[in-house]
From Swiss-Prot:
Nucleotidyltransferase listed as a keyword: no
Traits of the deletion mutant: Impairs growth on beta-alanine but can still utilize pantothenic acid.
This protein's UniProt keywords: Pantothenate biosynthesis, Transferase
Encoding gene (name): ECM31
Anything else known: Present with 1420 molecules/cell in log phase SD medium.
Protein name: 3-methyl-2-oxobutanoate hydroxymethyltransferase
Cited PANTHER family: 3-METHYL-2-OXOBUTANOATE HYDROXYMETHYLTRANSFERASE
């Protein structure tokens, strides 16, 4: 058995049939292997073919199709408004991008709250959208209070559906949390419950846990006690990896970003300046430039055309 495990991890030979010319992308085992080396994991959101192409070209380990697209791409004021049908459209678009990034997909608000059976059906539908969808992500509150979500996650795991759990600040539960606030920092009980929730999620089968807006000491401690990778956002650098919303990371909505975001570039300024230059070149007729941006027709054919309509 151990020999077979070593072969599966190191041999170049396949142990399964596959379609021709299938592009390889990261699997959960690939992510685990990197996690065991101690190398931090990289994860970024993507919401369509273009942003997914960027994430893949950058060789990001994981790509999250997050329900945050409700606000960053669709203009809603919260993630709660997003419908499953709208979300599926974006998941399909993301999966058309080529590359090795492993695709993890959120389960938006309303996709599992009405009942376990409905939630299972929706999770299966999401997994079947494309073979690249490797895992779902489920937000969950304290294990002592959000027993339903814990049970739902356990049901998913027991059926072989990979789950990345999301603890700490969970945007889908923002109303019950009293707003977008740091979690696990106000009381001993809150800290204990956050820790125990992570332990319970590992126990019921989650392959990874995302920790959002939690004090760095707390996130680092939880990570040290788990044997599955943690992905942090606003949780310090003591987690197994990091995730950011692509529009925050690339400045696609200007300078207004959360405290925990290190903005790599301000694409809003770059795009706005580019558009201004385009408009100016249109108005002063320097674009399109003849010969550079235009096509030619043979002179004799042009003269023949003019003659044919009596304009010569």
């Amino acid at each position: 058995m151990n020999i077979m495990k070593r072969q599966l991890c190191t041999s170049s030979k396949r142990f399964f049939s596959t379609a021709k010319n299938v592009v390889k992308y990261n699997t959960i085992q690939d992510i685990r292997n990197k996690y065991f080396t101690g190398t931090p994991l990289s994860m970024c959101t993507a919401y369509d073919f273009i942003t997914a192409t960027w994430v893949n070209k950058a060789n990001c380990d994981l790509l999250l199709v997050g329900d945050s697209l409700a606000m960053t791409s669709l203009g809603y004021d919260s993630t709660i408004t997003l419908s499953l049908n709208e979300f599926k459209y974006h998941v399909a678009s993301v999966c058309r991008a080529e590359g090795s990034s492993m695709v993890v997909v959120d389960m938006p608000f309303g996709t599992f709250e009405s009942g376990i059976s409905d939630g299972l059906k929706n999770a299966i539908d999401i997994m079947k959208l494309d073979s690249k969808v490797t895992s779902v992500k489920v937000e969950v509150g304290s294990y002592t209070k959000d027993k339903y979500a814990m049970k739902f996650i356990e049901e998913l795991c027991s059926r072989g559906i990979p789950v990345m759990a999301h603890i700490g600040l969970t945007p889908q539960k923002v109303h019950s949390l009293g707003g977008y606030k740091v979690q696990g920092s106000k009381s001993l009980l809150q800290m204990q419950e956050l820790y125990e929730t992570a332990m319970q999620l590992q126990k019921i089968g989650c392959w990874s846990i995302l920790i959002e807006c939690v004090p760095h000491k707390m996130a680092q401690f939880i990570t040290s006690k788990l044997s599955v990778p943690t992905i942090g956002i606003g949780a310090g650098n003591g987690t197994s990896g990091q995730v950011l919303v692509i529009s925050d990371l690339l400045g696609m909505q200007g300078d207004s970003v959360p405290k925990f975001v290190k903005q790599a570039v301000n694409m809003t300024d770059i795009a706005t300046q580019g558009l201004k230059e385009y408009i100016a070149s249109v108005e002063d007729r320097t674009f399109p430039e003849r010969g550079t941006h235009t096509f030619k027709v043979k002179e004799d054919l042009w003269n023949e055309f003019l003659s044919s309509i009596n304009e010569k």
